[in-house]
């Protein structure tokens, strides 16, 4: 049985009309019409060849028919992998080589290997045993059964069966569907189109115009009073070729305790914010004067006097207070009375100045004042020890001086001689 393809049929053509035409050349076992093409099955191959020769381009109902042998690949075909093929080999030469063992349904060459589809399994096994490891155009061929799956992506043979959309007539790289199954966009489509980084041409509404001369995120967001004064996320920001200069930034939102007028005022924005009019960034909004940290305070020449900074001072004074304070006039020399010294400011007292202690007051307690130890008393005229190291000198040898006749406070004496 031979299958004949009949194409380019008129919509008014019926299966009976096709059957009557082909029955003139032989017996017809089956005749079917699908849309604008059909298939005719004839028993004899010679009769089929005669019908094809006479009915090809035959005018039927005002349209010329295309009559040819059906090229549909049988489902029982066997796929062979042919390796180590010469670069000068063509599909016709390879097909002719395998047709010596049986009918070949399809033959495709990919680089230095090829796939050959044979109609019967017996013919495929015979071709493997006869052609494997044999010389063909100067190279030893490797012929074996193919272990690869069915073709899932086009690239070999004819343009049939796009694996993305399932339609025929194009390859996957030409398919209008992208990898995610959505249609690709044209020059005027919406979404992430090719107009994202340019200006001119048809523009979409999505996140286009980012680096062009138009608003940054395009006014696709509705106008709001939340963060900007313009249309949502998008007043001219990153655009106009000016970077941050013409941005209008984050406006003060309404509802934060200020009136509606202030809610629309640009705080970090306007053209003065980032220096379009020659103003610096601090001029964008009024602010408190910047106070430098204490450790950065320096003299006009940028040098810090570490001696003055870290020298010892009385309690309550600081280096920075002394620097800022006006130097007072030199005070007169202080008296020895404690009352006057207490009235002097603490920052005028030299911590390293030593003054004699005031004379102790008269004892008011009834405690017994003990005699001063003779060991601790020494004559003024003596340059060394006036007593021996082994024993104490008699008391009568050391004369008493008038300085020790003054009554002493036992508590003051204890604190003075305590070690």
UniProtKB/Swiss-Prot annotation:
Gene transcribed to yield this protein: rbm4.1
- Residue ranges of every copy of the RRM domain listed in the record: 2-72, 78-148
Phosphoserine carried by residues: 393
Q: Which UniProt keywords are listed? A: Metal-binding, Nucleus, Phosphoprotein, Repeat, RNA-binding, Zinc, Zinc-finger
Source organism (scientific name): Danio rerio (Zebrafish)
Does the entry feature the keyword Phosphoprotein, yes or no?
A: yes
Q: Where is this region: Disordered?
A: 322-341, 349-371
GO cellular component terms listed in the entry, alphabetical order: nuclear speck
Q: List the disulfide bonds.
A: none
Q: Where are the zinc fingers (CCHC-type)?
A: 160-177
Listed GO molecular functions? Answer: RNA binding; zinc ion binding
Annotated protein name in UniProt:
RNA-binding protein 4.1
Q: InterPro entries, alphabetically?
A: Euk_RNA-bind_prot (IPR050502), Nucleotide-bd_a/b_plait_sf (IPR012677), RBD_domain_sf (IPR035979), RBM4_RRM1 (IPR034897), RBM4_RRM2 (IPR034898), RRM_dom (IPR000504), Znf_CCHC (IPR001878)
Tell me which Pfam families the record gives. Answer: RRM_1, zf-CCHC
